[in-house]
Amino acid sequence: MRLAESEARARLVAHDHGILCTVHVERGVDAVPVAYVVDEDGYVGVPVDRVKPKASSRLQRERNLEEDPRATLLVEHWDRGDWSQLWWVRAELRSQGGAAPARAAALAAGLAGRYAQYRDQPFARVLVLRIVRVTGWAAGAS
C-alpha cells in the first residue's frame, strides 16, 4: 500500500543507511550504499569521509552530480520471515553543489551525532541534496 508522504518522510529520517543513485553520463545509473542524515528543512547530507579507503579523492558520485544534479535515495526494510513488514521509501533529490557552508556544517554535525565513526567529523566533504519528492510503499498498513 502506498505510504502517505508524511509517513514515507518519517521512515526516511529514521532509517540509517540507503542506496544513493546518481546518473553517469555513459553508464546510466550508478548506485552506491551510503550513510546519511536528513535535516528538518528537507536536506540530505551524505558524507565523503576519511574513515574508509577511497580509490580517488573525488568520488564518482560527486562527478556524476556535477554533470546531472538529479539523484535518488532508496531505503528499505526487509524481513525474510515476515513479508507483512516489508517497506521501501524513495527520495528524489537535487544536488546543492554550492550549498551554504552553514548547511553543510549542520549536516556534518547531524552525521557526527548519528554515527559513532563520525564523532570527530572526519569528512573531506558533505554532499548536500535537497529533497524534491518522497514516495513509499509498505506491505502492511502504515
Summary of predicted features, one role per range:
Residues M1-C21:
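Short, basic/aromatic recognition patches
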Residues R2-L3, W78-S142:
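Charged, gly/pro-rich active-site loop segments
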Residues A4-E7, A31-V32, R58-Q60, Y115:
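A generic local structural motif
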Residues A8, S57-N64, R103-L107:
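Amphipathic alpha-helical interface surfaces
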Residues L12, N64-L65, L111, L129:
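A generic structural signal for nonpolar/aromatic side chains embedded in well-ordered alpha-helices
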Residues V13-H15, V29-A31, D39-D41, S57-Q60, ...:
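Short connector loops at helix/strand junctions that flank enzyme active sites
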Residues H15-P53, L73-V75:
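Short beta-strand segments
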Residues V46-E76, R80-G81:
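Helix-adjacent hinge/juxtasegments
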